[in-house]
Amino acid sequence: MVALKGVPALLSPELLYALARMGHGDEIVLADLNFPASSICQCGPMEIRADGLGIPQLLEAVLKLLPLDTYVESPAAVMELVPSDKERGLQTPVWTEYESILRRAGCVRALAKIERFEFYERAKKAFAVVATGETALYGNLILRKGVLALNPLL
C-alpha cells in the first residue's frame, strides 16, 4: 500500500515500479489464485504479490495509471475455456465485469480469448505477473501497455 496523492492506495510499491518501467507493448498479467505465477516467473517475468485482492478492484486501480495499447486489435486478453468447461456450460461472469471496467477506462475493444497453453506461453514473455487472490475461474487477464501522448502535435 502507498500513500501518495492521486495513486490508488491498493497499488503496492512493487506494482507501481513495474508499471513505470514497462514500455509500449510490454504486457502485465493479473493472475487469479489458481495461476502458476511462481512457475511462470521462473521464465523471466517479475513476480508481484497482491494476495487478497480481487482482479476487478486491481484492474480499476491499474487503469488509472496504465495507458492501454491502441495499436493492437485488443489490449486485453483472457484465457479461453478448455473444451470440457465449454461443454459443461461453465460461465465466466468476471469477463463481463472486466469489459465494463475497460469500457469505463476508454477501451472499447473486445477481450481477446487465448487458448490455455498459448496464454501460459504469452505470460512467460510478460514484463510482470501479479499474483492476486481472485477466486473467479478463468479470471486471468493480460494487459498490453500503450503510449502517452505527452506532447501532442498541434
Curated annotation (Swiss-Prot):
GO terms for biological process: female mating behavior; fucose metabolic process; fucosylation; GDP-L-fucose salvage; negative regulation of neuron differentiation; neuron differentiation. GO terms for molecular function: fucose binding; L-fucose mutarotase activity; racemase and epimerase activity, acting on carbohydrates and derivatives. Substrate binds at residues 32, 79, 120, 138, 140. Its EC number is 5.1.3.29. The keyword Isomerase applies. It catalyses: alpha-L-fucose = beta-L-fucose. Disulfide bonds: none annotated. Keywords: Isomerase. Involved in the interconversion between alpha- and beta-L-fucoses. L-Fucose (6-deoxy-L-galactose) exists as alpha-L-fucose (29.5%) and beta-L-fucose (70.5%), the beta-form is metabolized through the salvage pathway. GDP-L-fucose formed either by the de novo or salvage pathways is transported into the endoplasmic reticulum, where it serves as a substrate for N- and O-glycosylations by fucosyltransferases. Fucosylated structures expressed on cell surfaces or secreted in biological fluids are believed to play a critical role in cell-cell adhesion and recognition processes. Mainly homodimer, but also exists as homotetramer, homooctamer, and homodecamer. The homodimeric form seems catalytically inactive. This is Fucose mutarotase.
